[in-house]
C-alpha cells in the first residue's frame, strides 16, 4: 500500500497504545483509584491485537531480508513484547471476568508485566527506527 510495507503502517498503534496503557495503569495504581484501570484495560487489548499483526507482518519482512543482527534483535524484541502483551491482555480479561480487578488496589502481576511490555516496546521501536534510517541511508 503506497509502496510502504504493511508492517510500518501497523506497528505504530501497539507502540502508542502500550505506552499509554502503562502510564494510565501506573497512575491509577499510585493514586489508589482502581476504577481508572478500565480505559487502560481496553488499550491493552487493542495493543495486543495490534502487536499480533505487527509480529506477523514483521516476520514477513524479516523473511524477505538478509539476516542482520539488528533485524534479528528487533524481531526477538518484538516477539517478546507481543507475547507479553497478549499474556497481559488474557490475565486482565480473566481478572475482569472474575470481578477481581476493580476491588483491590495492590500491585498486580499484570501491572509489572505491562510496565515490562511498555519498556520492551520502546526498545523495539528504537531498534526498528534505527533500521529504517539505515535503509534510507541516513
Stretches found by the model and what they are:
Residues 1-138:
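Polytopic transmembrane helical bundles with strong interfacial aromatic enrichment
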Amino acid at each position: 500500500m503506497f509502496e510502504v510495507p504493511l508492517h510500518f503502517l501497523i506497528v505504530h498503534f501497539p507502540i502508542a497504545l502500550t505506552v499509554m496503557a502503562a502510564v494510565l495503569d501506573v497512575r491509577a495504581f499510585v493514586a489508589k483509584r482502581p476504577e481508572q484501570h478500565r480505559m487502560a484495560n481496553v488499550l491493552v487489548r487493542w495493543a495486543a491485537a495490534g502487536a499480533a499483526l505487527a509480529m506477523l507482518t514483521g516476520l514477513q519482512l524479516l523473511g524477505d531480508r538478509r539476516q542482520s543482527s539488528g533485524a534479528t534483535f528487533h524481531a526477538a524484541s518484538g516477539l517478546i513484547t507481543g507475547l507479553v502483551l497478549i499474556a497481559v491482555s488474557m490475565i486482565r480479561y480473566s481478572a475482569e471476568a472474575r470481578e477481581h480487578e476493580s476491588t483491590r488496589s495492590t500491585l498486580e502481576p499484570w501491572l509489572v508485566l505491562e510496565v515490562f511490555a511498555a519498556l520492551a516496546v520502546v526498545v523495539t521501536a528504537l531498534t526498528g527506527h534505527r533500521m529504517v534510517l539505515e535503509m534510507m541511508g541516513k
